[in-house]
């Protein structure tokens, strides 16, 4: 693909990707803290609140997996318009729910579209951004997670508190539909024809797409790395709030400030690491962020050090985000142009499944003491550090393999040009 033809649209696409991901992620994340509002307004059983977020996550993973082989067969712009309209339209429709069953159904349906939409969106970003700028630009798009935690979650709570529980759904749903109009206006047309010349036909059978990817050791290695990272990460993430309050006696009212500090620090470290990746320091970036992250986990949650929770949590969030965005930029080099949307969708599926399994496994492992404290968190912290180190070692194995493949492809293209 000739990236220069899309160069004038790069900034528009990257900015739109950030905003779309922020709204999409935020609308998924907001339902857990809105649980008490659902209980009072819809008479929802407290134990069913977890099914809303969990159901949407697994639905996104399943549909993302099933849809992946088809995603590269369509014009990226047209696919995005359809998928995002469904995604945010269903989110807005949640405001009409009159029972917990209706809300569960509508929100899970919205989650079904989230996986394929994210895959196509990220593939479009990778298509447009030159390879030597991907670290910085993907780190910029990766800030959407931090912004969702900093902006969308507090705003959703405030809207629900001041208006009603429906307000976050129609606010962010309609906001997402406005972004669809911006996609229609500012996004370049990206037909599959321009990708076919670099790989296979855009009409390749879905089964062939899956078989082609599964036959690639790089693809399997990339999915394994992402799965290990997300599994280790979500051994801890779902239980932080309870652990901080019940084990560390951290004030409930200060939890939001804690996440604000972590989110702001994450935005800084992601941009820093993105710049380092573009300068060719991929291996060093992964090693430094992972080793520091493992040290923070062990010193903050395992070893008997009396460190400030603000320091520990801020470093944890900042290093986790930097490592994740760096890994995403590295693995973005795995698929060929005609495989990108499928790969991104499969990668999202792997991440969702791994995080879901980790959440369930960690919840089953932890127990509550007679004093109301959580037992077993330090063991989970050790396991999280081990998974982080394992993912680091595999990433260090992936980087030279990608470089070697790039050299071979460049040599092959040079030979073909010479022959002509």
Indicate residue ranges for each PLM-predicted region:
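Juxtamembrane intracellular "pre-TM" segments in multi-pass secondary transporters
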Residues: 2-7, 190-223
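Extracytoplasmic gate region of multi-pass secondary transporters
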Residues: 32, 219-259
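Conserved MFS/SLC helix-loop-helix module at the cytosolic interface between two early adjacent transmembrane helices
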Residues: 62-98
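Cytoplasmic helix-loop-helix junction between adjacent transmembrane helices
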Residues: 108-144
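Helix-loop-helix hairpin linking two adjacent transmembrane segments in secondary transporters
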Residues: 140-187
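A membrane-interface helix-boundary motif in multi-pass transporters
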Residues: 161-173, 366-388
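C-terminal transmembrane helical hairpin of 12-TM major facilitator-type secondary transporters
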Residues: 283-327
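A late C-terminal transmembrane helix in Major Facilitator Superfamily
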Residues: 338-370
């Amino acid at each position: 693909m000739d990236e220069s033809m899309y160069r004038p649209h790069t900034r528009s696409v990257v900015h739109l990707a950030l905003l779309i991901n922020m709204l999409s992620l935020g609308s998924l994340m907001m339902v857990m803290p809105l649980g008490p509002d659902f209980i009072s307004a819809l008479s929802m059983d407290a134990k069913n609140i977890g099914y809303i977020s969990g159901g949407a996550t697994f639905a996104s993973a399943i549909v993302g997996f099933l849809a992946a082989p088809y995603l590269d067969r369509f014009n990226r712009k047209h696919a995005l318009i359809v998928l995002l309209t469904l995604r945010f339209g269903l989110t807005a429709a949640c405001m009409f729910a009159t029972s917990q069953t209706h809300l569960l159904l509508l929100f899970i349906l919205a989650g079904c579209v989230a996986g394929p939409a994210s895959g196509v969106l990220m593939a479009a970003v990778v298509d447009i951004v030159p390879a030597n700028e991907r670290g910085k630009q993907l780190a910029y798009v990766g800030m959407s997670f931090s912004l969702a935690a900093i902006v969308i979650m507090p705003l959703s709570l405030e809207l629900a508190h001041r208006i009603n529980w429906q307000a976050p759904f129609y606010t962010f749903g309609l906001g997402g539909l406005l972004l669809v109009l911006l996609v229609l206006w500012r996004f370049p047309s990206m037909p599959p024809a321009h990708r076919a010349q670099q790989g296979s036909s855009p009409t390749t059978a879905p089964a062939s797409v899956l078989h082609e990817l599964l036959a690639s050791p790089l693809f399997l290695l990339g999915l394994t790395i992402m799965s290990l990272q997300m599994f280790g990460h979500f051994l801890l993430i779902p239980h932080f709030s309870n652990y901080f309050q019940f084990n560390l006696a951290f004030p409930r009212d200060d939890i939001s400030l804690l996440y604000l500090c972590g989110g702001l620090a994450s935005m800084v470290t992601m941009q820093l690491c993105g710049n380092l990746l573009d300068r060719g320091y991929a291996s060093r970036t992964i090693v430094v962020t992972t080793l520091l992250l493992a040290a923070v986990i062990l010193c903050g949650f395992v070893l008997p050090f009396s460190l400030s929770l603000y320091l520990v949590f801020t470093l944890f969030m900042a290093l986790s985000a930097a490592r994740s965005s760096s890994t995403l930029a590295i693995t973005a080099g795995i698929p060929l142009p005609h495989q990108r949307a499928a790969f991104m969708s499969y990668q999202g599926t792997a991440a969702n499944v791994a995080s879901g399994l980790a959440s369930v496994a960690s919840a089953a492992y932890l127990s509550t003491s007679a004093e109301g404290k959580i037992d077993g968190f330090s063991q989970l912290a050790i396991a999280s550090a081990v998974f982080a180190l394992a993912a680091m070692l595999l990433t260090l194995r992936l980087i030279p393999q990608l470089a070697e493949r790039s050299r071979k492809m460049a040599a092959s293209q040079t030979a073909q040009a010479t022959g002509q």
